[in-house]
Swiss-Prot record:
GO molecular function: GTP binding; GTPase activity; protein kinase binding
Species this protein is from: Schizosaccharomyces pombe (strain 972 / ATCC 24843) (Fission yeast)
Annotated positions of the Cysteine methyl ester modification: C197
Entry GO terms, CC: cell division site; cell tip; cytosol; nucleus; plasma membrane; plasma membrane of cell tip
Lipid-bearing positions (S-geranylgeranyl cysteine): C197
Superkingdom per UniProt: Eukaryota
Name under which the protein is recorded: GTP-binding protein rho5
InterPro entries attached to this UniProt entry: P-loop_NTPase, Small_GTP-bd, Small_GTPase, Small_GTPase_Rho
Compartment(s) where it occurs, according to its Swiss-Prot or TrEMBL record: Cell membrane
A single BP term in Gene Ontology: small GTPase-mediated signal transduction
Membrane topology reported for the UniProt record: Lipid-anchor
Residues reported to bind GTP: 13-20, 60-64, 118-121
Length: 200
């Protein structure tokens, strides 16, 4: 009989980008219709990956700036980190590079990171497209998400819709698989020291 593995997953990203809905749909199977900002919340869910049973402790966090000093308390003893953004909010993808990746690398430097595009059901939503066009913006494309994932050295880029329950299980199966790896951040962006060549 195989022993059950326990893994801790932390999810971060801008406020209202879809983190909590993603966790609730995966762990409870229901989509919460009312938005209530999270401070800290924990869920537990089981996942079967490659014949192994894994208990995932899911740590939800607040994306709002008010909680920037509290959020780091969620990071210790984690095995994998999800950085989320919403495809209907281009600034949430900008913040992946401008805020979230530096915070995650500071507190979880050797962990696998998954970049997750949430709310993909809104990508082709006429109302969303119209609203974004007022500020000369468009919903984030799959390719744009993938480019950012490569830039931040993510283990993988995935997309999902918690509302339609599409791609949700794949996100957590991939995260569980990543959490079992001995991870070395080979492609994490680092500031390179300039080397000077001296010609003799």
């Amino acid at each position: 009989m195989t022993t059950e593995l326990r893994r801790k997953l932390v999810i971060v990203g801008d406020g209202a980008c879809g983190k909590t809905c993603l966790l609730i749909v995966f762990s409870k199977g229901t989509f919460p219709e009312v938005y209530v900002p999270t401070v800290f919340e924990n869920y537990v869910a089981d996942v079967e990956v490659d014949g192994r049973h894994i208990e995932l402790a899911l740590w939800d966090t607040a994306g709002q700036e008010d909680y920037d000093r509290l959020r780091p308390l969620s990071y210790p003893d984690s095995h994998v980190v999800l950085i989320c953004f919403s495809v209907d909010a281009p600034e949430s993808l900008d913040n992946v590079q401008e805020k979230w990746i530096s915070e995650v690398l500071h507190f979880c430097s050797n962990l696998p990171i998954l970049l997750v595009g949430c709310k993909v059901d809104l990508r082709n939503d006429p109302k969303t497209i119209e609203e974004l066009s007022k500020t000369s913006q468009k919903p984030i494309t799959f390719e744009e998400g993938q480019v950012v994932a490569q830039k931040i050295g993510a283990y993988k880029y995935l997309e999902c819709s918690a509302k339609l329950n599409e791609g949700v299980n794949e996100v957590f199966e991939t995260a569980a698989r990543a959490s079992m790896l001995k991870f070395k951040p080979a492609s994490v962006p680092k500031t390179k020291k300039k080397k000077h060549c001296i010609l003799l």
